[in-house]
């Protein structure tokens, strides 16, 4: 295309098709020869002016699909539940330690026991009964009627039967002019009229744990 036609095309005096086709001639020839399409005019100007050889991009990190691949490099979570190590396991208790003596209010004090129940003491012939239900109230009444101090251990009874037996023993002690005293939780002492048990002696009975062993 002549220079005059270019000027006319620039000022709108001639169609632009011929003007634009000039810049695609090389690409058209390449498309016919090699089978590739024409490129925009701007890319050709940049390549010709600055020696630009095409778009280049920095390769980013490759996509890693899947949940398992995403966390493959991360340290695996160690669960809280784990088998105990040898030094974590408590040493088994010795049988002798499990059979250790009773402490506290139920501990037996042999010396105190001897003083309380030595021969000639009013409590020397004391007996301990551990009824399982209310049907054993008769045995308690017979022992008490014979003049024997009776310790009633009601720990193994349910509360309903224990309450009935307590009411029976209290009425029995009142009828025979004896005394009825609480020694420990669900443990009571029935004393005949001729046996005087002081508060100190009741405390020592509870501390010595006599009712648990006799």
Curated annotation (Swiss-Prot):
The Gene Ontology biological process annotation of the record reads: division septum assembly; FtsZ-dependent cytokinesis
Q: What is its main location?
A: cytoplasm
What the entry lists under InterPro entries is as follows:
Cell_div_SepF (IPR023052), Cell_div_SepF/SepF-rel (IPR007561), SepF-like_sf (IPR038594)
Per UniProt, subcellular location reads as: Cytoplasm
The entry's keywords: Cell cycle, Cell division, Cytoplasm, Septation
Region annotated Disordered, chain positions: 25-51
Query: Quick one: a GO cellular component term?
Result: cytoplasm
State the Pfam families in the record: SepF
Q: Which residues form a coiled coil?
A: none
The family assignment reads: Belongs to the SepF family.
Q: How does it assemble?
A: Homodimer. Interacts with FtsZ.
What does this protein do, in the record's words? Cell division protein that is part of the divisome complex and is recruited early to the Z-ring. Probably stimulates Z-ring formation, perhaps through the cross-linking of FtsZ protofilaments. Its function overlaps with FtsA.
The name under which this protein is listed is Cell division protein SepF
Lineage at the top is:
Bacteria, Bacillati, Actinomycetota, Actinomycetes, Mycobacteriales
